């Protein structure tokens, strides 16, 4: 714990959520969440979760904050910024936890961030207006699980697609009538890709030279992502301030890079590589077609 930053809380509050309380603190204008109460509330193992938080402290900005705990005694509490809470929550796969805590985990994933955010921005905690039950959203979660498995996405990325498509901040805000539409949308993404869908094939309007430039740019982004992944373990080992950025740049853009690949493939189907002004970076085109990412020496 010596390498963990220690901060002094300016203001602490217990925010009610799901019949329990979540301990929060304000430090230098940033809202933090005490993690042990959250872990205990859900029913997870604190020992395993604190190990993950310590191992990935740069990603989650995990710090110790001197604050008044539940027993009214002042002590150091391990915390992460509120804005990082969803990232941690969605790092836990509901299908891999005990059945008796699965629904509670899902409820935290879908609602907790919004409740805490409302508290610190509006001065009061309000549960989002419920439109569907956890059981009613089960088919959608199953579809998301399939999307994550088939497309190798992270859960926040998969849920973000639904949020953007239906203009909501969480799937809990979906109307009951929207659930089947969301499930159909996710299934279509799994089968056909988000930007391909069932649309009629359009004539390519890019020249071979223009297409080559975009493919080259995609290839640089793809290989840069792999480079950041390679750098992260070394940066973390020397406790570099850049380790967090290396982790983020190595992981957070994978979804966009994948979407860009789908768009490029869809718009370059008719490109003749034998044209005089055609592709010159053939290796980049091969990596695009094969969805190739340079191999990593590390496992993430």
UniProtKB/Swiss-Prot annotation:
The keyword Calcium belongs to this UniProt entry's keyword annotation: no
Keywords: Transcription, Transcription regulation
Matches recorded under Pfam families: P22_AR_C (PF10548), P22_AR_N (PF10547)
Domain of life (superkingdom): Viruses
Function: This protein prevents the prophage P22 c2 repressor protein from binding to its operators and also inhibits the action of other prophage repressor proteins, including those of phages lambda and 434. The synthesis of antirepressor is negatively regulated by the protein products of the two other immI genes, mnt and arc.
The protein's name: Antirepressor protein ant
Organism name: Salmonella phage P22 (Bacteriophage P22)
